[in-house]
């Protein structure tokens, strides 16, 4: 029996705990920061705050103690917001060991440092030991995963055996896991698509039609690909689950928090008011925009959509003005990387 610690009981962390718990053969411990989450799971086997529709199997134990969650764990699954990863791994460090496998399911890039999530974990843990790391990503809505709707993701690691281990431990008939060696592309695809999803939502909020969203998704994929390649990613990954797959889902699906932020911005609402109404949930694209611009500047990569999203989110630019500027850029060839 594999012992798995799931660190983070938001919607996505809870959904993954459900997948692992229903698979059988796992002892799953779900760590939650929020006392309300712990209480509701203990009382009703539901996460009333973040994923109230889903029933959590008895094979999943909930705790608010990191020590208890990590005790004896063979796999540590990190599903916390990107801005908490460094702090929590620093807090967990005394309880971590080199025989653990660390799996990151967080789709984000750290602000200021521009590090991907596995890089953050590696930087924190390496003074003690060299961590064994895997990143998982793909087109996933937590609600559908928890429900058992057919889903496919990618597990990426420079160590193929580690990727296959995660593939084996996470797969079931309703949750298919592929492997990939391109950690850079898988993580950047999962993080950067959130920025493009906000842009797609703005188009819907402004009622600009389907053509505009299709154009944004396509050109958004082009700039994500350019940055990923500049950082060492592989172009093939951008055509896969962690690239195109996740981008299409997040830009068009009604359950996308990042797209929803864009829709509300397009309707004229203020970002602070939108975030305040999200009940503690995180739209990673808002934070990732800063890091994406930093990475683009570092590598000399042109990312016009991302630049306009940064201006809207952090500089108060009008969404209508941003769209107008994107459409009036100098003409160029379509295919260039």
UniProtKB/Swiss-Prot annotation:
Reactions catalysed, as given in the entry: sn-glycerol 3-phosphate + NAD(+) = dihydroxyacetone phosphate + NADH + H(+); sn-glycerol 3-phosphate + NADP(+) = dihydroxyacetone phosphate + NADPH + H(+)
Pfam families: NAD_Gly3P_dh_C (PF07479), NAD_Gly3P_dh_N (PF01210)
Keywords: Cytoplasm, Lipid biosynthesis, Lipid metabolism, NAD, NADP, Nucleotide-binding, Oxidoreductase, Phospholipid biosynthesis, Phospholipid metabolism
Cellular compartment(s): Cytoplasm
Enzyme Commission code: 1.1.1.94
Any one GO MF annotation of this record: NAD binding
Pathway(s) this gene product operates in, as recorded in its UniProt entry: Membrane lipid metabolism; glycerophospholipid metabolism
Annotated residues for binding of sn-glycerol 3-phosphate: 107, 138, 140, 193, 246, 256-258
GO biological process annotation, one example: phospholipid biosynthetic process
Keyword Nucleotide-binding appears in the UniProt entry: yes
Binding site for NADPH: 12, 107, 142, 257, 282, 284
Active site positions, chain numbering: 193
Coiled-coil blocks: none
EC supergroup of this enzyme: oxidoreductase
Primary site of residence: cytoplasm
Gene Ontology CC terms, in alphabetical order: cytosol
Cystine crosslinks: none
UniProt keyword Oxidoreductase present: yes
UniProt cross-references to Gene3D superfamilies, sorted A to Z: N-(1-d-carboxylethyl)-l-norvaline Dehydrogenase, domain 2 (1.10.1040.10), NAD(P)-binding Rossmann-like Domain (3.40.50.720)
Record-stated family: Belongs to the NAD-dependent glycerol-3-phosphate dehydrogenase family.
HAMAP family xrefs: NAD_Glyc3P_dehydrog
Function according to Swiss-Prot or TrEMBL: Catalyzes the reduction of the glycolytic intermediate dihydroxyacetone phosphate (DHAP) to sn-glycerol 3-phosphate (G3P), the key precursor for phospholipid synthesis.
Name assigned to this protein: Glycerol-3-phosphate dehydrogenase [NAD(P)+]
Species in which this protein is naturally found: Koribacter versatilis (strain Ellin345)
Organism placement in taxonomy: Bacteria, Pseudomonadati, Acidobacteriota, Terriglobia, Terriglobales
């Amino acid at each position: 029996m594999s012992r798995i610690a799931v660190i983070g009981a938001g919607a996505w962390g809870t959904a993954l705990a459900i997948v692992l718990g229903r698979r059988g053969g796992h002892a799953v411990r779900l760590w939650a920061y929020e006392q309300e989450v712990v209480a509701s799971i203990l009382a009703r086997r539901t996460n009333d705050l973040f994923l109230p529709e889903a029933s959590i199997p008895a094979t999943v134990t909930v705790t608010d103690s990191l020590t208890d969650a990590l005790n004896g764990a063979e796999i540590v699954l990190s599903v916390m917001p990107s801005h908490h990863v460094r702090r929590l791994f620093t807090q967990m460090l005394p309880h971590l060991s080199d025989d653990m496998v660390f799996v990151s399911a967080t789709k984000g890039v750290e602000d200021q440092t521009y590090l991907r999530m596995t890089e953050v974990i590696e930087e924190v843990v390496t003074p003690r030991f060299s961590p064994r790391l895997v990143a998982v990503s793909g087109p996933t809505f937590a609600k559908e995963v928890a429900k058992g709707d057919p889903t496919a993701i990618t597990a990426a690691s420079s160590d193929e055996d580690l990727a296959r281990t995660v593939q084996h431990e996470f797969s079931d008939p309703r949750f298919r896991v592929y492997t990939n060696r391109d950690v850079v592309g898988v993580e950047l695809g999962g993080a950067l698509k959130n920025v493009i999803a906000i842009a797609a939502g703005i188009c819907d909020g402004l009622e600009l039609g389907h053509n505009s969203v299709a154009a944004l998704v396509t050109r958004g994929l082009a700039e994500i690909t350019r940055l990923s390649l500049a950082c060492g990613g592989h172009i093939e990954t951008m055509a896969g689950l962690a690239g195109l797959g996740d981008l299409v889902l997040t830009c068009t699906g009604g359950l996308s928090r990042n797209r929803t932020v864009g829709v509300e911005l397009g309707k004229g609402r203020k970002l602070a008011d939108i975030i305040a109404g999200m009940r503690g949930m995180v739209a990673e694209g808002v934070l990732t925009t800063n890091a994406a611009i930093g990475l683009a500047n570092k590598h000399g990569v042109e990312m016009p959509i991302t630049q306009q999203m940064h201006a809207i989110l952090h500089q108060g630019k009008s969404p209508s003005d941003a769209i107008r500027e994107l459409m009036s850029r100098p003409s160029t060839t379509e295919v260039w990387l």
